Regions:
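Flexible, glycine/small-residue-enriched loop-and-beta-strand segment within the central core
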Residues: 89-99, 104-173, 198-211
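Terminal amphipathic alpha-helical/low-complexity segments used for targeting or macromolecular assembly
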Residues: 1-82, 199-211
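Extracytoplasmic/periplasmic beta-strand context in beta-sandwich domains
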Residues: 171, 192-193
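Conserved G/P- and acidic residue-centered "switch" motifs that form tight phosphate/ATP-binding loops
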Residues: 179, 197
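Short helix N-cap motif at coil->helix boundaries in the Bergerat
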Residues: 187
Length: 211
């Protein structure tokens, strides 16, 4: 046997003896937050949703604003120090919501967070606003199978939403964006704009004062 053949044989022998790396299958939660098809009936997700509902009930029953803020800080994926939220508040899981400093929301905020919702500093959210990340298949066979998916929402600093604003899945907004009352935001926009209408469009640009 030639030297090269011996070396090659030993190489393949040693490779075969190496422990094979195990690749764990993604959980339904991991698939969900990645925007892939997932099963909302998964036991882990059902338990997470049940835990979120307990916090939701506690939050909505609490009359002290500081205690409500503490519930939010123990519930959301991340928050800053200054959080002020009025009831009623509705969410799926809560753990996929990330809010910055000086976050304020008025009555009846809905944040459905099958995918991450990220909002920067100094946000002011009017009453009856909705941030919706869930999506359902258009094909009826897929939809009836129970599979769902979603897309994240990302919003920059200094966001102001008037009453009844809806932000749909996959939207990214820049800094200093104002969404006028009743706006339905279906696509992404950059910095320093006022949005209005259904679907929302740029009404005007905002001149920003420089320091």
């Amino acid at each position: 046997m030639g030297v090269s053949l011996v070396v090659t044989s030993l190489l393949y022998y040693n490779i075969g003896k190496q422990p094979q790396k195990e690749y764990a299958m993604p959980t339904e939660y991991e698939k969900m937050i990645a925007g892939e098809f997932y099963k909302p009936s998964d036991l882990e997700l059902r338990a997470l949703a049940a835990s979120s509902r307990e916090k939701q009930w506690a939050f909505n029953a609490e009359t002290d604003r500081l205690k409500r803020a503490e519930i939010v800080k123990s519930w959301f994926g991340s928050t800053a120090e200054n959080v002020a939220m009025n009831p009623q508040f509705v969410t799926d899981y809560g753990v996929n919501i990330h809010i910055g400093e000086n976050f304020y929301s008025n009555w009846n905020l809905t944040m459905l967070d099958v995918c991450p919702i990220r909002i920067g500093d100094n946000a002011m959210i009017g009453p009856n606003c909705q941030f919706l990340t869930p999506l359902h298949p258009l094909d009826p066979t897929e939809r009836n199978s129970g599979l769902e998916y979603g897309a994240p929402i990302t919003i920059g600093d200094n966001f102001w939403a008037g009453g009844g604003v809806t932000i749909l899945p996959g939207v990214t907004l820049g800094d200093n964006v104002v969404a006028g009352a009743g706006a339905v935001v279906t696509k992404s926009f950059g910095d320093n704009v006022v949005l209005g209408g259904n679907p929302a469009r740029v009404i005007k640009e905002i001149p920003v004062k420089k320091d």
